Regions:
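A late C-terminal transmembrane helix in Major Facilitator Superfamily
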Residues: 29, 235-272
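Symmetry-related core transmembrane helices of the 12-TM Major Facilitator Superfamily/SLC fold
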Residues: 53-72, 277-292
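Cytoplasmic helix-loop-helix junction between adjacent transmembrane helices
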Residues: 1-23
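Interfacial helix-cap and linker-helix signal at transmembrane-aqueous boundaries
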Residues: 35-47, 143-144, 175-177, 262-271
Length: 306
């Protein structure tokens, strides 16, 4: 998806484009939480199926339909778009082909594999994804620990952080594009998320305070996620873009497995989610450090690997 967007949007508009597309994630959390809760409670036993089975059927079928629609309607690149005039195609391709003020970009996949900056970005993305997925998976449990036991009520409460995240994502992407800055717009929200997650255990027993802290932390992590992807898209260009972005994405997305799993291990070992929240905070803080220290220019990397 990131590579596809990089073929349509130049570096100057990339953060906002990413925000508009990936805001679907938090919106899915807003709609999906209450909808899933309603499906599981209302359709349990209908047709001999459990509530969770109906949930997978009802929520999975639209994905299949949208997949078919995308296949037949989206063009691979501006030159293939039937809805653009020749002049519009030329303008879009000129913007995408521009370097956005970055004189040195990685243009070959072999250079991607040799460049330490790519691996630093991969690890930073891992550290961003780790708490995002952990929060998504464990949020209902965290709220249950504060006394929320009704399934439908739990679904509505779990949607609140994603409303904030959707708004924060768009605001972060818009401002990052407006000022032309990426690193701090990704790193500082990650640092804020780390601080919020670290103090959340101290609010245990207070539902409103816990939900407020988790909401703010979720919004900050999604802000960091949104602007992060504008960094590699400005660095990796040409034939290397697909492979380079895929490499960062593949390494980083493994955090989506380790995040929820690690919180489960910590809870099993300690009997509490507090340690898991602190682990999420550490990962968010590490992502901040990795992004801020990723200052070495691609030109320097080229000179070193030449």
């Amino acid at each position: 998806m990131i590579y596809y967007l990089s073929r349509w949007y130049g570096p100057k508009r990339m953060a906002r484009a990413i925000a508009l597309v990936f805001v679907a994630g938090p919106i899915g959390g807003v709609v999906g939480g209450p909808l899933s809760a309603w499906l599981m409670s209302s359709l349990a036993g209908v047709g001999g199926l459990s509530g969770w089975q109906w949930m997978f059927l009802v929520e999975g079928l639209p994905c299949l339909a949208l997949g078919a629609l995308v296949w037949f309607t989206l063009a691979n690149r501006p030159a293939d778009a039937r809805w653009l005039t020749p002049e519009e195609k030329r303008l879009v391709e000129a913007e995408v082909g521009g370097n956005g003020g970055h004189e040195h970009r990685i243009d070959s996949f072999s250079e991607v594999l040799r460049n330490p900056r790519v691996y630093r970005l991969s690890l930073a993305y891992f550290c961003i994804i780790f708490p995002i997925y952990a929060m998504s998976f464990w949020l209902p449990t965290l709220l249950k620990e504060q006394g929320v036991n009704d399934t439908l009520r739990l679904g509505w409460y779990a949607a609140i952080p994603y409303v904030a995240a959707a708004i924060a994502m768009y605001a972060a992407g818009r401002r990052s594009d407006a000022v032309g800055e990426r690193r701090y717009h990704s790193a500082l929200p990650a640092l804020a998320a780390a601080a919020l997650l670290a103090v959340t255990p101290y609010a245990s027993g207070h539902l409103v305070a816990t939900l407020a802290l988790l909401t703010a932390a979720t919004a900050c992590m999604w802000m960091a996620y949104t602007v992060f992807w504008a960094i590699p898209s400005e660095t990796i260009a040409g034939p290397a873009a697909a492979g380079g972005i895929a490499l960062i994405n593949t390494i980083g997305l493994s955090g989506g497995f380790w995040g929820p799993a690690a919180l489960g291990w910590v809870k099993s070992a300690t009997g509490s989610t507090s340690g898991g929240l602190l682990l999420m905070a550490c990962m968010a803080a590490l992502s901040c450090v990795l992004i801020l220290t990723n200052k070495r220019t691609v030109a320097a990397a080229k000179a070193r690997t030449a």
